[in-house]
């Protein structure tokens, strides 16, 4: 596992203890293999960051996503890499922005299955603030677009595009968005729909 228990304790001391959510999804064989391929060296995590700017959230679109399907940027921490260094590296690669983490919001414990196969996955979710840079992906092989999205878009057109894609992984991201945006509204970090 790339992220040690000690690293998580340090992150929780600095950014707070997250709410833990358990989810389960049955995947197609194709999607399951794609997740399996991402598990080199035992990786079983991603860090997702909701970068908030002017009551909007930074979202990204990957080349294989259908038009209109966006999600919060995310990435993996490399073996031996400091947690915060990995997050800032991923944020810069995917969005062109320099960020600082604000709060550790959620730890999603997800069980992806395909027949008898099981992948236990953890998504660490943070709120973040842009501190510099320009909103434009640096790693253009992995990310084709980065932009700001309103709460209305996240709950409306973007959510619909993620679900309509038929991808279990994108359905998971739609549900993750719903849960995180609700918490950000409840904490006053985002204004509710139609109030921005």
What does each model-identified segment do?
Residues 41, 67-68, 108-113:
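Short, solvent-exposed loop/turn segments at secondary-structure junctions
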Residues 2-48:
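Acidic, metal-coordinating catalytic segment for phosphate/diphosphate chemistry
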Residues 52-93:
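Conserved Nudix-box catalytic region and its N-terminal flanking loop in Nudix hydrolases
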Residues 104-106:
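Residue-level detector of beta-propeller blades
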Residues 77-100, 109-164:
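Unchanged
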Residues 42-46, 52, 65-67, 72, ...:
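Short connector loops at helix/strand junctions that flank enzyme active sites
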Residues 1-3, 141-196:
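Nudix hydrolase/Nudix homology domain
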Residues 46-48, 98-101:
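Conserved beta-strand residues within beta-sheet cores
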